[in-house]
């Protein structure tokens, strides 16, 4: 039995949603049974168990974890680093790093003298890198005489970014880098014991001794505790018989707050301080339009230039090789459906319409009706594309997820046009042609799911790979009919720790999009599974998200699909925005089954039996 009570604290259902939901799911089973159990891990109402590791929710405001990664990586002889004054990234523009090749003799090595803000004394970029064959003590030297002289003569040193270092605020010189004992976390450099350089004889040449081992664990700062610090009472609250779920919900709300920048927009994560079109859009669609429509609006408007949507970087630079920017339209529509803001509707309609006109001229393939361009969010060519494919090949390919986004975009344009008394038929026809093209050219009958993309040069063929995000979007947005939707959820390959971005994997390619699970993709998969009524699939996806967030004590960007470890992927970040949105979506999109339309809110809850109780 489902019983839902709703109280809106604002007069209009489509204004900012501040509500209390009470959801009762009655069943014979109750709370001390496992929520999910597999050979790899178990989710209990208050804890996660994985081998010798356990994460336990002591309350809805505290989680303890003893997870320590066993992942180690061989150290390379080529190291990259930057110098820092006062623990800020103020030596050079992002991406301009120093290089050195470790060449130890009896375990010791000394660098030539580097100069702050200047090119390397030796151009090491073309030197081959090997694995370090002995633990090494490196004496690294930095010439700061020009900077110190400038501060003495002018009273300040002007950094590349325009900031000034004065004698009064000059606190110290630090080194940042990617291999332990170095760290790229500039803000923490002053507190790290292996980062401050010293000028012991006062000659202006700073030195530091660094110890590099033959193998290393990429991050040695393993968390053991999350405890709620911020007041989150102004956001929708959630409570249930599952203490772990309550704590993860609260942790996600807190991380969402931490991801709000000074300008009111969302950053993509701790390591990604910028506003990214696809990151904020997918996050907004999942749950952030519901939780924080104001920051969602600010984020989307930060990605508009000259009245058009900005495409994120990707293969070939950006648009039109990457062409998934229209996910912005889906997020904008979600905000309108949640808030009912007519001014927002009018503004976004003009932006989406203008952007779509460029896409139809430049990106749409007239023969198939599909839109060309890179896989949505899979924007690192080597990770998911064959070696022979260069940017022009990727531009000419037709991807599942990107086309699902375009399909929904034109449905949205048609709906917006109707609400604004504008012609809508062209948009409806465009959407239908995309849907027809996806089902005609990308459906793999023998596998029971869609192909990642059509690719080729003179002749195009179907890639045998699945693509988790595209499969999920096709189900959620109705590209697939009921029969195909059921088959997609039942047949798309899933690993023991979750659904990988693509399947099969590229051998020899390090995990990132390849051989990796991304919690936000997992959340879309859970949403799609719930929409088809596939309880087992939804249960597994929710468990995948909760396992990682609890053990790692943050909503990580990704983790390795074969090990379940967040170490081992090429890049990873804490409190990744779309992972935060995905965690919250387990509550909003699955347990409550919430969906918003321009005139109503609907509930179609899917609550696995193990999650029974009042929430």
Walk through the language-model features, giving the residues of each:
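Structural helix-adjacent loops and short alpha-helical linkers that scaffold large soluble proteins
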Residues: 235-246, 287-300, 335-353, 367, ...
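Bacterial Sec-dependent N-terminal signal peptides
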Residues: 1-34
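Aromatic-rich carbohydrate-binding modules that target alpha-glucans
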Residues: 32-78, 85-104, 156-214
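Acidic/polar, glycine-enriched structural segments that form the non-catalytic walls/loops
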Residues: 216-273, 337, 342-344, 349, ...
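Extended glycan-interaction surfaces of carbohydrate-active proteins
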Residues: 21, 235-274, 295-319, 364-398, ...
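Active-site neighborhood of glycoside hydrolase catalytic domains
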Residues: 400-442, 446
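Non-catalytic C-terminal accessory modules of carbohydrate-active enzymes
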Residues: 495, 524, 528-615
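Aromatic-rich carbohydrate-recognition surfaces in CAZymes
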Residues: 274-280, 284-375, 379, 399-407, ...
């Amino acid at each position: 039995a489902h019983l839902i009570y709703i109280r809106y604290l604002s007069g209009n259902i489509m204004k900012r949603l501040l509500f209390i939901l009470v959801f009762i799911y009655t069943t014979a089973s109750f709370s001390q049974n496992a929520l999910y159990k597999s050979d790899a891990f178990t989710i209990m109402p208050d804890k996660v168990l994985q081998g010798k590791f356990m994460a336990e929710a002591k309350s809805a405001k505290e989680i303890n974890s003893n997870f320590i990664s066993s992942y180690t990586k061989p150290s390379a002889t080529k190291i990259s680093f930057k110098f820092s004054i006062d623990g800020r990234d103020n030596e050079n523009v992002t991406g301009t790093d120093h290089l050195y090749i470790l060449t130890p003799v009896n375990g010791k090595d000394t660098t030539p003298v580097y100069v702050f803000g200047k090119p390397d004394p030796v151009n090491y970029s073309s030197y081959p890198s090997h694995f370090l064959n002995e633990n090494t003590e490196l004496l690294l030297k930095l010439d700061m005489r020009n900077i110190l002289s400038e501060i003495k003569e002018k009273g300040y040193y002007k950094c590349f970014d325009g900031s000034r270092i004065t004698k009064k605020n000059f606190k110290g010189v630090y080194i940042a880098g990617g291999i332990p004992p170095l760290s790229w976390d500039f803000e923490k450099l002053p507190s790290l014991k292996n980062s401050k350089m010293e000028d012991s004889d006062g000659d202006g040449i700073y030195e530091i001794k660094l110890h590099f081992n033959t193998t290393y664990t990429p991050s040695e700062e393993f968390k053991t505790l999350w405890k709620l610090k911020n007041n989150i009472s102004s956001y929708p609250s959630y409570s249930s018989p599952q203490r772990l779920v309550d704590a993860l919900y609260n942790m996600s709300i807190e991380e969402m707050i931490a991801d709000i920048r000074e300008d009111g927009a969302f950053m993509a994560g701790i390591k990604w301080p910028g506003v990214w079109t696809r990151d904020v859009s997918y996050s907004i669609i999942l749950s952030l339009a519901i939780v924080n429509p104001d920051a969602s609006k600010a984020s989307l408007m930060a990605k508009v230039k000259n009245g058009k949507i900005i495409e994120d970087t990707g293969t070939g630079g950006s648009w039109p090789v990457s062409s998934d920017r229209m996910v912005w339209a889906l997020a904008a529509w979600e905000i309108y459906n949640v808030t009912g803001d007519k001014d927002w509707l009018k503004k976004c309609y003009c932006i989406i319409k203008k952007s779509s006109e460029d896409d139809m001229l430049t990106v749409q393939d007239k023969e198939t009706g599909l839109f060309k361009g890179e896989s949505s969010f899979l924007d690192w060519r080597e990770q998911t594309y064959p070696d022979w494919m260069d940017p022009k090949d990727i531009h000419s390919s037709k991807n599942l997820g990107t086309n699902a986004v375009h399909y929904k975009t034109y449905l949205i344009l048609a709906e917006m046009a109707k609400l604004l008394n504008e012609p809508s038929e062209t948009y409806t026809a465009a959407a239908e042609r995309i849907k027809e093209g996806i089902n005609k050219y990308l459906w793999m009958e023998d596998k029971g799911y869609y192909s990642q993309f059509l690719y080729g040069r003179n002749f195009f063929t179907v890639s045998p790979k699945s693509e988790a995000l595209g499969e999920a979007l096709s189900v959620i947005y109705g590209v697939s009919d009921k029969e195909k939707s059921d088959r997609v959820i039942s047949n798309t390959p899933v690993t023991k720790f979750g659904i990988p971005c693509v399947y099969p994997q590229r051998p020899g390619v390090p995990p990132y999009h390849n051989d990796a699970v991304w919690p936000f993709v997992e959340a879309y998969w859970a949403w799609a599974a719930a929409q088809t009524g596939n309880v087992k699939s939804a249960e597994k996806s929710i468990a995948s998200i909760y396992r990682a967030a609890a053990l790692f004590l943050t909503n990580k960007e990704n983790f390795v699909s074969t090990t379940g470890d967040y170490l081992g992927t090429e890049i990873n970040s804490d409190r990744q925005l779309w992972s935060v949105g995905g965690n919250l979506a387990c509550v909003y999109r699955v347990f409550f089954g919430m969906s918003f339309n321009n005139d109503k809110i609907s509930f179609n809850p899917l609550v696995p039996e193990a999650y029974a109780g009042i929430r």
